[in-house]
Regions:
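A short, aromatic/hydrophobic, helix- or strand-capping loop or linear motif
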Residues: 68, 115-122
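Single-residue recognition of alpha-helix capping/boundary positions
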Residues: 8, 101, 110-111
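Alpha-helix boundary/capping and short turn/kink residues
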Residues: 50, 108-111
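Bacterial N-terminal signal peptides that target proteins for export
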Residues: 2-15
Length: 133
């Protein structure tokens, strides 16, 4: 009977880590591919100084990240491609791993506290859109 040496243990550990890494990647890809959600933020009117929105932006980034969110776009230069009406002056698109993560972010106490800052200087429309698998 052969005994395991330190070398065997290291090799088996590396194989185990490799399998775990592949499984984590597959799980993350499957979750994103099947359940991603995108939050579209539109600033409709500005009622206070721009510094209020800058303060909100600094606070909100960490909160979004805490819930697995990532900003895909932020812009103050938006173009109306079809339809009528005014184009929101500022827009953002945030991706989340799932609709549940987006809802948890939005309803979290941290985000609701930050929203008070946001709302003190503007009105917004915020919509969650289910991603395509």
């Amino acid at each position: 009977m052969r005994s395991f040496t330190r070398k065997h243990f290291v090799v088996l550990s590396l194989i185990g880590l490799g399998i775990a890494g592949v499984m984590a990647t597959v799980h993350a890809f499957a979750q994103t591919a099947n359940g991603a959600a995108y939050v579209i933020v539109e600033r409709l009117t500005t009622t206070g100084p721009e510094s209020i929105q800058q303060e909100y932006g600094k606070v909100s980034r960490d909160i979004v990240a805490k819930f697995g969110g990532r900003y895909l776009a932020r812009s103050q230069q938006n173009t109306l491609l079809e339809g009528e009406g005014t184009v929101p002056c500022c827009m953002a698109i945030i991706s989340f791993p799932s609709t549940e993560a987006a809802k948890n972010w939005f309803s979290s106490p941290e985000n609701q506290d930050a929203a008070k800052i946001r709302r003190s200087g503007a009105t917004f429309r915020i919509v969650s859109v289910q991603g395509v698998p």
